[in-house]
UniProtKB/Swiss-Prot annotation:
This is Uncharacterized protein YGL014C-A. It comes from the Eukaryota.
Length: 53
């Protein structure tokens, strides 16, 4: 019974760590997506000029 409780506590700690990691990764992904979007926008503008040439 004590082992089961220990496992549950360990699992809760693991899941909170997982949540923190997920939040951190998501924040990083959002900022990287923003940079990528700006880069694509620049490429499209540059691409339009390239198509004209």
């Amino acid at each position: 019974m004590r082992n089961l409780h220990h496992l549950r506590v360990g699992h809760e700690a693991h899941s909170t760590h997982h949540l923190w990691m997920w939040k951190h990764l998501r924040r990083r992904a959002i900022s990287e997506l923003r940079i990528l979007r700006n880069f694509i926008r620049k490429c499209i503008r540059g691409g339009v000029f390239l198509w004209i040439i």
